[in-house]
């Protein structure tokens, strides 16, 4: 499993994104993506330019808006969310549904022109297996929590090869590492890349030290740049190792 994009190239796109993000229609996206994940999602989509995006998890709709900015030739977004009443932004390019990704027939979609975006706090494995079964190659996993945090099973937890935590409803439960899950990802993933944070503060979003226990790509900017990008600095804690996956 290898990286697809270089740190230097990712950083070159920050200034352009800052201008895009400054014009976002939803300024307070609490509970959803903010700049630490909006930027890498935008970057990946600009590079891949899919015709179709499956968006699993819509929330207020800011991600949907972002997809339109990154992919001007986008033909359709299939936006999935069981709670559409939270949506503030509605796209003319989106087809909205409540039916889960796993329960939808995707056979008519052009697999080579589709990217699947998971932002639904769900077990990643059945979803990755569904992508493999259907033939989808390009995936973004937004909720890619490390082994000691988070409310769902993620690629980062699996690839850590460590016992992992699921923190749900106020209860933290430790689960044993599953070697068969690691082997499945190792066998079926061509590219796996955790996208870098824009800023990396001393503490994680959970308030503990952001050290070697949280392996992380080098940040794109240092604290000395915080006055140049105040919004990025303000939202620096909203990072959970968003990743790009290309299946074999």
For every predicted segment, state its role.
Residues 1-116, 120-248:
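A short alpha-helical cap/connector motif
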């Amino acid at each position: 499993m290898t990286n697809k994009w270089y740190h230097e190239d990712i950083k070159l796109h920050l200034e352009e994104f800052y201008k895009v993000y400054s014009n976002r229609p939803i300024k307070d996206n609490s509970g959803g993506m903010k700049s630490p994940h909006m930027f890498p999602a935008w970057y990946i989509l600009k590079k891949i330019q899919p015709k179709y995006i499956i968006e699993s998890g819509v929330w207020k709709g800011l991600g949907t808006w972002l997809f339109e900015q990154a992919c001007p030739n986008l033909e359709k977004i299939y936006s999935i969310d069981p709670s559409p009443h939270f949506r503030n932004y509605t796209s003319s390019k989106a087809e909205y549904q409540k039916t889960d990704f796993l329960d939808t027939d995707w056979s008519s979609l052009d697999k080579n022109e589709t990217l699947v975006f998971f932002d639904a706090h769900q077990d990643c494995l059945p979803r990755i297996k569904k992508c493999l079964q259907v033939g989808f190659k390009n995936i973004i996993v937004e909720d890619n929590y490390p082994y000691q945090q988070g409310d769902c099973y993620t690629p980062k937890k699996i690839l850590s090869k460590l016992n992992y935590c699921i923190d749900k409803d106020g209860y933290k439960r430790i689960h044993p590492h599953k070697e068969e899950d690691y082997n499945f990802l190792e066998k079926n993933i061509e590219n796996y890349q955790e996208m870098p944070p824009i800023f990396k503060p001393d503490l994680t979003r959970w308030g503990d030290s952001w050290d070697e226990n949280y392996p992380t790509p080098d940040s794109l900017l240092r604290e000395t740049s915080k006055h140049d990008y105040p919004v990025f600095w303000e939202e620096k804690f909203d990072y959970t190792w968003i990743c790009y996956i290309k299946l074999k």
